[in-house]
A protein has these predicted regions:
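C-terminal amphipathic helix plus adjacent low-complexity
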Residues: 208, 328-469
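A short, flexible N-terminal coil/short beta segment enriched in small residues
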Residues: 1-19, 215, 223-235
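Donor nucleotide-activated moiety binding/catalytic core segment of transferases
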Residues: 42, 213, 221-224, 240-289, ...
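Catalytic binding pocket for nucleotide-activated donors in carbohydrate/polymer assembly enzymes
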Residues: 253-259, 286-356
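Hydrophobic/aromatic beta-strand patches that form the interior of the parallel beta-sheet core
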Residues: 38, 60, 81, 112-114, ...
Length: 469
């Protein structure tokens, strides 16, 4: 069956920690509809696409590409579709995010643009007026994954192991974005290169972004002072901090050694930590929605009112802004007090997140089939492609291992690692050590999917194929 022509769906992953498992859910949904799926790092997916002999299939991305990259992809793929995960439930300004991440000269290249809910659907139709017939109210595969994993979290071995090791704890999910001045400078550089600064509106927007990022850094520093005080408290459960994958982790690394009760943990997926916790404190990221589906008590921490994101995560959470309120929330979690239980906000949810009898993944897969992309045979890499992939992987892993070895040695000596290039650190954090067949199988186990009907194969380094037998 895997040697016949099928629709090929290409799913590039930018960040493994929060993108990978939901994309596997989408991949399995597609495979069940007889679509062959390739999931991997963006570099590996693109290497395959640019080297395949045929032209066909669907490239599924999250936005942010330039016109030259998109045209290059469309020469080798029948369709280019977008579900921009940056326009998530925690985004209080989806208008700006949509316009910033999709340049006007790219609009006509988009065959389908999938959106999270009714609010973003109406906004997208106004912003992308030329292609409004191609805008699909789909929902989000990440929500599909939240729902499925929340139902099965009681059986998770990882969750049980975490609870056994750490007991009762409160999980803080960091989403400051700006945890160092060099991160603020890098963000400024990225926006200044993307925005047309000859326009007054964009100059004003860049100033607003810079001001917001500096406030975020200031708030992060305030939070660190609070953590240092909370670390001395014995009356509350342990607080475990999970830094965001795209934050600068080096300030967190520096702090890690100075705490005794508070833990800063980078390893593994977020889900088992969330499900093992007694409650969640967050900064407005979409993980708040996952906590909501898991019926976990949650609180939105704000130490600067100007930095509050008045989006869905804020509306479904208790609002806290001091050590006293953090302590009270933590103790309430131990007593199972949760004023924001699931289904209390169904109307608010339905505005932001589209839920129907069909999952978001089903809606997207059905739309992909309607596009009628050219079917292709399975990809067979040549020796040269395998060699190039192996060499690139060797260089990447060498840099990753070097990074971690130096960091571990310095940690042992009571010091912390300072990188000369924050973008290099970011690469290690996004997809550390790569994407493997075992990663896919682990997600299938987590979700309780039967593996008997699915073929999972490693194609190249950081590139896996998934299809129906």
């Amino acid at each position: 069956m895997n040697n016949i022509k099928k629709i090929n769906l290409y799913l590039p992953i930018e960040g493994k920690a929060r993108e990978f498992a939901p994309k596997v859910f989408l991949a399995i949904t597609a495979a069940k509809k007889n679509i062959r799926v390739f999931i991997g790092s963006q570099a590996s997916i693109n290497r395959m696409i640019y080297n395949k002999k045929s032209s066909g299939g669907v490239y599924f991305f999250k936005g942010g590409l330039g016109i030259n990259e998109v045209k290059k992809i469309k020469k080798k793929c029948s369709n280019f579709v977008i579900l921009d995960e940056e326009v998530g439930p925690g985004d209080e300004n989806p208008q700006f995010t949509m316009r910033y991440r999709i340049e006007k000269n790219i609009e006509n290249e988009i065959d389908s643009y999938y959106v999270l809910g009714k609010e973003t659907f109406e906004i997208a139709k106004k912003i992308f007026n030329k292609i409004k017939s191609r805008i699909i109210l789909s929902g989000w595969p990440r929500i599909d994954y939240f729902l499925a994993s929340a139902k099965l979290d009681k059986d998770s071995k990882l969750k049980k192991n975490i609870k056994k090791k750490y007991g009762n704890f409160i999980l803080f999910i960091s989403d400051y974005g700006q945890t160092s001045m060099r991160m603020v400078k890098l963000t400024h550089l990225q926006y200044s290169q993307k925005l047309d600064l000859s326009k007054r509106y964009n100059k004003k927007k860049l100033y607003e972004i810079d001001s917001s990022n500096k406030r975020a850094l200031k708030e992060f520093k305030k939070f660190i002072l609070i953590l240092k005080n909370l670390d001395k408290e014995n009356s509350i459960p342990t607080i475990i901090v999970r830094p965001h994958p795209l934050e600068d982790h080096e300030p967190w690394e520096k702090l890690k050694k100075s705490f005794s009760n508070i833990k800063i943990i980078f390893d593994g997926e977020l889900e088992p930590w969330l499900y093992a916790s007694r409650g969640v404190i967050h900064k407005g990221c979409s993980s708040a929605v996952q906590a909501y589906y898991a019926n976990k008590p949650q609180a939105y921490l704000s130490l600067d009112k100007k930095n509050i994101r008045n989006a869905l995560p804020y509306k479904i959470s208790r609002h806290i802004s001091s050590i006293k309120e953090i302590k009270k929330f933590s103790l309430d979690c131990l007593n199972n007090k949760n004023e924001f239980k699931k289904n209390n906000f169904s109307k608010e949810f339905n505005k932001v997140i589209h839920l129907s009898s069909k999952s978001a993944s089903e809606i997207i897969v059905n739309d992909i089939k309607k596009l009628k992309p050219i079917k292709e045979f399975n990809f067979k890499p040549t020796f040269n492609i395998i060699l190039k992939s192996w060499a690139n992987n060797l260089i990447h892993n060498y840099n990753v291992y070097k990074f971690y070895i130096i960091r571990c040695i310095l940690q042992f000596l009571g010091k912390h690692y300072v990188s000369s290039d924050i973008r290099l650190v970011s690469q290690h954090q996004k997809i550390p050590f790569g994407i493997f067949k075992s990663d896919v199988l682990r997600v299938l186990d987590t979700l309780g999917f039967a593996k008997n009907d699915i073929i999972v194969k490693s194609v190249l380094n950081d590139l896996i194929s998934i299809e129906k037998k």
